[in-house]
Amino acid sequence: MISAIRPAVRSSVRVAPMANTAFRAYSTQDGLKERFAELIPENVEKIKKLRKEKGNTVIGEVILDQAYGGMRGIKGLVWEGSVLDPEEGIRFRGLTIPDLQKQLPHAPGGKEPLPEGLFWLLLTGEIPTDAQVKGLSADWASRAEIPKHVEELIDRCPPTLHPMAQLGIAVNALESESQFTKAYEKGVNKKEYWQYTYEDSMNLIAKLPVIASRIYRNLFKDGKIVGSIDNSLDYSANFASLLGFGDNKEFIELLRLYLTIHADHEGGNVSAHTTKLVGSALSSPFLSLSAGLNGLAGPLHGRANQEVLEWILEMKSKIGSDVTKEDIEKYLWDTLKAGRVVPGYGHAVLRKTDPRYTAQREFALEHMPDYDLFHLVSTIYEVAPKVLTEHGKTKNPWPNVDSHSGVLLQYYGLTEQSYYTVLFGVSRAIGVLPQLIMDRAYGAPIERPKSFSTEKYAELVGLKL
């Protein structure tokens, strides 16, 4: 049984109001679980008030094309952590990516935000102190060990099995450790669901670097295990160490940035929605995230970062890296005329350059300005929007997050493209699991939208087929 939540000493630290965001305070509890427990009654009352007073208010219309077009634009999900504006990009609890880079805690001597701080922000809506983030890092480190049967399961995977498939298998296998499932089977009160979901989520996030690095070392480094979890290090530094990059401070900084900006992107994308959907059936965080990771593995979602780099390397092999804009323009047109897409460009919601792309570009300008692949990516950025606009078949000719990440990883020696989506998966857990905890705390029901056949839709719109 999980022990009762105990009050902790309050902090008096405050942060000043910011433009375009509500006033926010540093969290007032030393422990994340304790602080979230404080917030639950207030947030539940807000939801009750909203539904009681405005529950019958129309919030949007649905046209037939949306039903056949992937449900894009339909307002039908609740996602607290982030909101995506087509013109501005993503905001995490009201904060832009530059806001996160400035205001979330950093590692000593570092410039990039720690993903632990983002997790705290997403769950509470508050910016944690340095001490609170350090405590969260240590908490995750203390939970990182994985069961023997999960180690053996990963080690038995054939080298032909994609890293994302291995990741999904391993996360599913952690179901044996689920506190939520065990508590549910014992008949725990539903008001306590969130506590067990919290514990599972914390354990899962903590174990992902160990799982992900074992997959990497098995597939690409002959199974030689390096590094170990150090309770004094942050999450990204430990992950980098397990991968074999623990001595590279720049790579660790990149990993901090990568894990932060890939974590959350509203709730309607495949991995986020799948995790939330499966969780709504009261499946544990392990089963729910595993389902989300299987969605992330798809080429139209997270696997796109692998395909972008493969395409860039293919371009380089054909036209070289010391190329002109005219060379790239011709190559882009040849790609489009062959019926292929230009990977890394376009987005289901965004209509401007993805701020996550911009953050990675700024990192590259600081750390690798003369790198030939960065030069190639930059030149593509100058040419592709014009070509795609002239081609006329995309609503968004601007680069997305996948357009840049692979090049950064290549620079530091993580060259195995098939592994890139695994890094995305580790990051995505940090973004989607806070919502799963909130769903259980706020009593979110199982999802069950209505579906119709084509014949029924035709009847609804008055058309005889």
UniProtKB/Swiss-Prot annotation:
InterPro entries the record matches: Citrate_synth-like_lrg_a-sub (IPR016142), Citrate_synth-like_sm_a-sub (IPR016143), Citrate_synthase (IPR002020), Citrate_synthase_AS (IPR019810), Citrate_synthase_euk (IPR010109), Citrate_synthase_sf (IPR036969)
This protein's record includes keyword Mitochondrion: yes
Pathway the protein contributes to: Organic acid metabolism; propanoate degradation
Chain sites annotated for binding oxaloacetate: 265, 347, 356, 428, 448
Top-level taxonomic group: Eukaryota
Key word NADP present: no
EC number: 2.3.3.5, 2.3.3.16
Catalyzed reaction equations: propanoyl-CoA + oxaloacetate + H2O = (2S,3S)-2-methylcitrate + CoA + H(+); oxaloacetate + acetyl-CoA + H2O = citrate + CoA + H(+)
Main location: mitochondrion
Gene3D superfamilies: Citrate Synthase, domain 1 (1.10.580.10), Cytochrome P450-Terp, domain 2 (1.10.230.10)
Annotated residues for binding of CoA: 72, 190, 300, 342, 344-345, 394-395, 400
Biological-process GO terms, alphabetical: carbohydrate metabolic process; citrate metabolic process; tricarboxylic acid cycle
Compartments where located: Mitochondrion matrix
GO molecular function, one term: citrate (Si)-synthase activity
A single Gene Ontology CC term: mitochondrial matrix
Active-site residues, record numbering mapped to chain: 301, 347, 402
Keywords: Mitochondrion, Transferase
Protein family membership: Belongs to the citrate synthase family.
Summary of the function given for this chain in its UniProt record: Component of the methylcitrate cycle that catalyzes the synthesis of (2S,3S)-2-methylcitrate from propionyl-CoA and oxaloacetate. Plays an important role in detoxification of propionyl-CoA, an inhibitor of both primary and secondary metabolism. Also has citrate synthase activity using as substrates acetyl-CoA and oxaloacetate.
Protein name: 2-methylcitrate synthase, mitochondrial
Organism, as annotated: Yarrowia lipolytica (strain CLIB 122 / E 150) (Yeast)
